[in-house]
């Protein structure tokens, strides 16, 4: 993991994408069971459990949130 990716992961965790947190994404409520998984600078995934079905899924962090996190890194 590069330094930039590590910083992005930390920023996303501060935004709530961390193990044990719940969030509504794509119209569904998920509970995260992993830390952010950075594939590329713009593709970030997180393992999560769908609260409605209990099914485990790998969910993509929405691009606007990733972009906002990257902008926050560039401003700092």
Each model region followed by its residue ranges:
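Intrinsically disordered, low-complexity, charged/polar segments
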Residues: 2, 53-76
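Short, hydrophobic/aromatic-rich segments at coil-to-beta transitions
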Residues: 19-20, 44
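Mixed-charge, Lys/Arg-rich low-complexity intrinsically disordered regions
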Residues: 1-19
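Short beta-strand-centered aromatic/proline hotspots
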Residues: 28-37
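Hydrophobic beta-strand signal
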Residues: 23-24
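Intrinsically disordered, low-complexity regions of eukaryotic proteins
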Residues: 33, 49-52
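Short, solvent-exposed secondary-structure boundary/capping segments
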Residues: 39-49
């Amino acid at each position: 993991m590069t330094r930039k990716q590590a910083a992005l992961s930390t920023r996303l965790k501060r935004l709530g994408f961390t193990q044990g947190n719940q969030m509504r994404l794509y119209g569904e409520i998920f509970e995260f069971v992993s830390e952010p998984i950075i594939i590329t600078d713009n593709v970030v995934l997180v393992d999560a459990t769908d609260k409605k079905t209990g099914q485990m899924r790998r969910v993509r962090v929405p691009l606007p949130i990733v972009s906002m996190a990257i902008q926050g890194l560039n401003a700092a």
